[in-house]
Amino acid sequence: MSDQAEPGFVRVRLDLSYDGKDFSGWAKQTSRRTVQGEIEDALRTVTRSSVTYDLTVAGRTDAGVHARGQVAHVDLPEAVWAEHEEKLLRRLAGRLPLDVRIWRAAPAPAGFNARFSALWRRYAYRVGDRPGGVDPLTRGHVLWHDRPLDLDAMNEAAALMVGEHDFAAYCKKREGATTIRTLQKLRWVRDPATGVLTATVQADAFCHNMVRALIGAALFVGDGRRPAAWPAEVLAAKVRDPGVHVVRPHGLTLEEVAYPADALLAARAAEARNVRTLPGAGCC
Amino acid sequence: MSDQAEPGFVRVRLDLSYDGKDFSGWAKQTSRRTVQGEIEDALRTVTRSSVTYDLTVAGRTDAGVHARGQVAHVDLPEAVWAEHEEKLLRRLAGRLPLDVRIWRAAPAPAGFNARFSALWRRYAYRVGDRPGGVDPLTRGHVLWHDRPLDLDAMNEAAALMVGEHDFAAYCKKREGATTIRTLQKLRWVRDPATGVLTATVQADAFCHNMVRALIGAALFVGDGRRPAAWPAEVLAAKVRDPGVHVVRPHGLTLEEVAYPADALLAARAAEARNVRTLPGAGCC
């Protein structure tokens, strides 16, 4: 997983979205429908290649998790890229299923690695608390919570979580991997028209289940079952707390991945590899 | 279909939403899954009744058409209403499938008829024209148009259609039914964040296929295949024009039904029955 394409290859950045409902997550798995698998198959077909060009992704999402601003890169032979560059998007649009869309395919700047060059990832988690349920048209990406939620209490709790911490209490354990993360943003807003609450969760990187555990803790504060200080107390204990409920995946959407200026991409990738052993496994 | 509940009955107004994707439309049909059928079954079950209480609806939507602001009424025996009033919403929420939600169930004012008392219906039709397709998370209620659309041209054409006209050119013919309608609003906006174009279409009532034919004509103007004056020329001809493409149903959502002040409900119902023979069949 280098930060330069091999000689004779072009590193292509892909910006894409998917509805995670009918996928077993991003990462390729035998006999499972995955986002990575669908895109690699489509690329192979539209470029009439016999080989599969592996994708590297910014955020490996779990089964049921969506993405609107996912980023990946793929290294294509120069000849393949030259032949297909112009029509690649339109052909992929025709070949890919409607629950995956690729918006942009363009040569990446030197030093670009979709995963290691990323500065941060921004997720949204959406929740409806209307007694009747969730708008049928958005039920695929909005969780229903059957108790009214107090926005201020949730934001009070959220403010105590931001910053660099050991998020062990909110992460699925993985041998040898650090759970130190910098949570840059955790903030709730309520849409005045629909009443839907959206959490914005942004960090340099996330460990597995981290976002959905943070949301689970927040909902217990929002519906009054726990005080606003509780999530931070759990955080301080640094051990997985069975009282923290990991919410369902369908409310979670990867909205954006940010990268530094081109000149800083390679340095960022090196930094991300060294400072912390980023998790090899899933992310949310 | 009177404007008063029979003695011993309470007329209950229901405000509801549904995702039309997996329904054969609103109106009950044997061996077909319909919105009316699902709700009447749920009502029968939660009230433990042996009889079915028939629903009267404001806008009978076709297969695949959604609703966010649909209104219906049902006449329930006073004893049934008294027993179930308090828990009806929560029980219906538990019994109904997630693609139908009832937000409110409350006694209707005297003279209320969900269909005939309505002043107007407001629909939205949503279209995406990004080359890559439509956001996978909203593809269920947004149509993809594979050519870029000119908002100004579409609004120029739309302005020529507003007012009271014979919309025969845009309606599925139905013997004995008038196609005179008052199109109160036809206006396009583009969401700056998503790029999705939304048409707001509001009229006292619609004849069958009218909205989707109006949208089909507008899209031909938007992508440059037809001039802005064309839809109005078709309108003036008063005969169904094969050049008018009826767009697919999934972009269409009934957003709101408006009613007059309580004191005017009965008069409005009488007016709606007399002035025009409102269509017995489908609406959009």
Curated annotation (Swiss-Prot), chains A, B:
It catalyses: uridine(38/39/40) in tRNA = pseudouridine(38/39/40) in tRNA. The active site is at residue 62. Keywords: Isomerase, tRNA processing. It is an enzyme of class 5 (isomerase). Substrate binds at residue 123. SUPFAM superfamilies: Pseudouridine synthase (SSF55120). One of its GO terms (biological process) is tRNA pseudouridine synthesis. Its EC number is 5.4.99.12. GO terms for molecular function: RNA binding; tRNA pseudouridine(38-40) synthase activity. Homodimer. Formation of pseudouridine at positions 38, 39 and 40 in the anticodon stem and loop of transfer RNAs. Belongs to the tRNA pseudouridine synthase TruA family. This is tRNA pseudouridine synthase A. It comes from Streptomyces griseus subsp. griseus (strain JCM 4626 / CBS 651.72 / NBRC 13350 / KCC S-0626 / ISP 5235). The lineage of its organism: Bacteria, Bacillati, Actinomycetota, Actinomycetes, Kitasatosporales.
